[in-house]
């Protein structure tokens, strides 16, 4: 654990909600007007965001190593600057290749300013007391779509999609650059200097190349993919069940409410369980929810209730992912190890944006797609049950 700068936690929370709102949620909100203006399909526009997320996943390991050695101030400030440039390029994109290039550049920014680096900072700042602050950060970040979806929609209505991205670039610059530059300036030391040496690299590889690490990584990635692919497509799936559009849209909003509830309850859940028990419980609850959503056509009230449960599982899963490495291997070299750990989750989250609708079309409907996802998550739960009990994680 290292000394925390005054205002650092508040700055991280404000920067996270703004960065998520503008570098991630803005495009799903703007996809219809972008498509209507350019003639690019909705899938193509969404694929640009997915491509950026893949870049973020690839860069995650390198970003984690830099964070361990250099600290967050310069890294996250630079990420914000790159994000501003990316949004400006989105606004000025004259063609599809340039539009994709803009979102690929946004992927560089995402790798430096979204959850993984913020989780690493909080883990270093708070050490054994990290779960509460991590919960707070994800609760605030969880409201990014609530705050920025209507704001982006308003900006698009007033300025058009290109003008709105110019305004968003200004907002990102005015909010996140000062927060990262001025409030992440505390000492970055836990009493023992970080060793960017052969010895430190060997320690990192010993963890990241272990069977236990890779099995946990794969099962967590499966959970990320399946839960996201189903819940993000709640509206078309419920429409296929005969539900009204208004109720289906409300159900998607309630998935978000479920995420908040899950995150609020996670600290107590964590105190009462072991890392393996938490993982298995979250996976089983998620699989059960997906099976019900896949196989039960009615009653609608039950489908909505299960959608909320699925949201709660996603909320818990976010914090489960944030603490998986530190709970098992401690906080030494956390940035590098966690960067390697979450890279597949970031990648499959990007793929799920387009894989869900694609599988639904291939299989003949969203319920059939949900069956596949439920089966995959069930398998992940069975594998997670076999994880050996970890040794107590050393305190930093």
Task: Give each language-model segment a name.
Residues 27-31, 210-264:
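Extracytoplasmic gate region of multi-pass secondary transporters
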Residues 328-363:
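A late C-terminal transmembrane helix in Major Facilitator Superfamily
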Residues 8-42, 60-63, 149, 230-235:
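Extracytoplasmic
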Residues 103-139, 330:
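Cytoplasmic helix-loop-helix junction between adjacent transmembrane helices
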Residues 58-96:
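Conserved MFS/SLC helix-loop-helix module at the cytosolic interface between two early adjacent transmembrane helices
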Residues 137-188:
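Helix-loop-helix hairpin linking two adjacent transmembrane segments in secondary transporters
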Residues 255, 259, 265, 272-324:
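C-terminal transmembrane helical hairpin of 12-TM major facilitator-type secondary transporters
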Residues 58-71, 262-275, 360-361:
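Helix-to-loop junctions at the C-terminal end of transmembrane segments
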């Amino acid at each position: 654990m290292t000394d925390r700068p005054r205002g650092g936690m508040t700055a991280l929370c404000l920067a996270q909600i703004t960065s998520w709102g503008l570098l991630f949620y803005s495009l799903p909100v703007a996809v219809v007007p972008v498509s209507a203006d350019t003639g690019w399909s909705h899938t193509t526009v969404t694929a640009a965001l997915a491509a950026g997320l893949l870049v973020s996943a690839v860069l995650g390991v390198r970003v984690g190593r830099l964070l361990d050695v250099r600290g967050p101030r310069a890294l996250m400030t630079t990420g914000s600057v790159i994000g501003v440039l990316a949004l400006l390029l989105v606004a000025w994109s004259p063609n599809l290749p340039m539009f994709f290039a803009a979102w690929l550049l946004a992927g560089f920014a995402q790798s430096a300013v979204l959850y993984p680096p913020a989780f690493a900072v909080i883990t270093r700042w708070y050490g054994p007391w990290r779960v509460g602050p991590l919960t707070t950060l994800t609760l605030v970040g969880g409201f990014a779509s609530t705050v920025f979806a209507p704001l982006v929609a308003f900006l698009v209505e007033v300025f058009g999609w290109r003008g709105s991205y110019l305004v968003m670039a200004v907002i990102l610059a005015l909010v996140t650059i000062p927060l990262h530059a001025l409030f992440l300036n505390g000492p970055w030391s836990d009493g023992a200097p970080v060793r960017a040496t052969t010895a430190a690299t060997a320690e990192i590889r010993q963890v990241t190349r272990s069977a236990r690490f890779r099995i946990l990584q794969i099962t967590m990635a499966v959970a990320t993919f399946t839960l996201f692919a189903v819940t993000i497509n709640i509206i078309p799936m419920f429409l296929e069940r005969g539900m009204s559009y208004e109720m289906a849209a409300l159900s998607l909003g309630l998935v978000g409410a479920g995420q908040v509830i899950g995150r609020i309850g996670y600290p107590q859940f964590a105190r009462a369980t072991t890392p393996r028990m938490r993982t298995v419980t979250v996976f089983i609850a998620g699989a059960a929810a997906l099976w019900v959503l896949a196989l039960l056509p009615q009653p609608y009230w039950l489908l909505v209730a299960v959608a909320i449960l699925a949201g709660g599982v996603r909320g818990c899963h976010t914090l489960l992912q944030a603490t998986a490495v530190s709970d098992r291997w401690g906080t030494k070299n956390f940035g590098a190890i966690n960067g390697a750990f979450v890279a597949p989750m970031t990648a499959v989250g990007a793929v799920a944006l387009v894989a869900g609708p694609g599988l639904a079309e291939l299989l003949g409907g969203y319920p059939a797609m949900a069956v596949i996802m439920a089966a995959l998550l069930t398998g992940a739960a069975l594998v997670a049950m076999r994880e050996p009990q970890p040794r107590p994680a050393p305190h930093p």
